[in-house]
């Protein structure tokens, strides 16, 4: 199965040509503009934010998805 160097699987994506379950949604995502927000203030005490890091580690970003063979993202599949 040819992937054309692109693979999408949920929030894990490598390009945009393969595995598009919702092509119209992908179009809207690519045309969305982003804005930067600067927050000035005091950071919370260390004990209050420790759970946030652990929650982020359990997501797909922590698994280091990368394009693999047969139109798959490693470790998740299209």
From Swiss-Prot:
Belongs to the metallothionein superfamily. Type 15 family. One of its GO terms (biological process) is reactive oxygen species metabolic process. Metallothioneins have a high content of cysteine residues that bind various heavy metals. Acts as a reactive oxygen species (ROS) scavenger. Possesses superoxide anion and hydroxyl radical scavenging activities in vitro. Involved in ROS homeostasis during anther and pollen development. Keywords: Metal-binding, Metal-thiolate cluster, Stress response. InterPro entries: Metalthion_15p. It holds the Pfam family Metallothio_2. Plants silencing MT4C show decreased pollen fertility and increased level of superoxide anion. Highly expressed in roots. Expressed in leaves, rachis, inflorescences and seeds. GO terms for molecular function: metal ion binding. PANTHER family: METALLOTHIONEIN-LIKE PROTEIN 2A (PTHR33543), METALLOTHIONEIN-LIKE PROTEIN 4B (PTHR33543:SF37). This is Metallothionein-like protein 4C. The gene is MT4C. It comes from the Eukaryota.
């Amino acid at each position: 199965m040819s992937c054309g160097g692109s693979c999408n699987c949920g929030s894990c994506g490598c390009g945009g040509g393969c595995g598009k379950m919702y092509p119209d949604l992908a179009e809207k995502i690519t045309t969305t503009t982003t804005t930067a927000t600067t927050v000035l203030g005091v950071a919370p005490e260390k004990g209050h934010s420790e759970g946030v890091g652990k929650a982020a580690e359990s997501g797909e970003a922590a698994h280091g998805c990368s394009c693999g063979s047969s139109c798959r993202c490693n470790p998740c599949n299209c």
